[in-house]
Design a protein with these regions (language model features):
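Catalytic-loop region of hydrolases
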Residues: 1-40
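N-terminal cap/lid subdomain of alpha/beta-hydrolase-fold enzymes
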Residues: 28-94
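A gly/proline- and charged-residue-enriched helix-loop-helix capping module
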Residues: 67-71, 83, 108-110, 117, ...
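Short glycine/proline- and acidic residue-enriched helix-loop micro-motifs
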Residues: 97-104, 185-191
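Conserved acidic catalytic loop of the alpha/beta-hydrolase fold
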Residues: 97-103, 110-130
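Conserved hydrolase catalytic core segment
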Residues: 126-169
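Alpha/beta-hydrolase-fold enzymes
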Residues: 151, 157-242
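Hydrophobic, aromatic-rich cap/lid helix
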Residues: 244-254
Length: 254
């Protein structure tokens, strides 16, 4: 897929308050120019993914695959608040020359969808044949379907819902607490701030994504007589570090 950047000049106001003078949206498309009448598939990614769906969804996206980039014009836009090409807390504030950190306006799903829809209009797409979203991408797909139902022929929502439950809210707050417990997080001295908190937050999220049986099947100790079980623990540490190596705590917090 081909990478692009779209700038929204003239100001962008956020649903929960606040605005920025210029908004940037990163996105990927099939590697050719869109022409009217092409079949369009739009993919909304999960929280820590980027807009290159061919990379992280390689089993489904690409030439000759289910979401065939040769047959369909496929678009995936990077969500606002991310650190993968769209404006967010890690972006540079033009007034200070430093990252926004917590001065970046709070982002809602509707804000993300408005930015994606601006990209759609910029490309010149008038109709989307299939809209697909997973996790927070599913929230975006659902919101977009409600805001502009006439745009879509079919929509697919994966691992999502119309509103999060108290159970999910509790998991998310525990992750925020982990970030805030890292003293480097609020210091806002560099985008490496909150790294250890991010590692911990990711391990909390992993437990919500998986189940007890899964850990028993895949993270069982090789030696049942071991004094100190470590396989599942080392897996958690590995996954926490893996995310912190490619993502920043501020974008995760947002």
């Amino acid at each position: 897929m081909k990478q692009h950047t779209y700038r929204i000049d003239g100001g962008f106001s956020f649903e929960a308050g606040g605005s920025v003078s210029t908004l940037q949206v990163g996105y990927h498309t099939s590697p050719y120019e869109y022409k009217k009448g092409m079949k369009v598939i739009w993919i909304c990614h999960a929280l820590t993914a980027d807009s290159n769906a061919e990379d992280w969804w390689s089993a489904l996206v690409g030439p000759g695959k289910l979401f065939d980039t040769d047959k369909y014009f496929i678009v995936c836009g990077n969500m606002l608040g991310s650190c993968y090409g769209s404006s967010g807390p890690s972006s540079i504030d033009p007034e200070t020359g430093k990252p926004y950190y917590f001065s970046f306006p709070k982002v809602t799903v509707r804000d993300i969808v408005r930015a994606l829809d601006a990209v759609r209009e910029h490309i010149g797409i008038e109709h989307i044949d299939l809209l697909v979203g997973a996790s927070i991408g599913g929230f975006q797909a659902l919101e977009w379907s409600v805001m502009k139902p006439e745009l879509f022929t079919r929509s697919v929502y994966i691992a999502t819902t119309s509103r999060i439950s108290p159970w999910v809210t509790a998991f998310e707050e525990s992750q925020r607490m982990a970030l805030e417990a890292d003293q480097t997080f609020r210091a806002c001295e560099s985008l490496d701030g909150g790294r250890k908190g991010l590692e911990c937050a990711r391990t909390i999220a992993l437990i919500s994504y998986r189940c007890e049986d899964g850990y028993i099947r895949k993270q069982q100790e090789a030696d049942a007589d071991t004094l100190f079980a470590d396989r599942a623990a080392s897996y958690q540490r590995y996954q926490g570090k893996k995310l912190a190596d490619r993502f920043d705590a501020y974008s995760y917090y947002y």
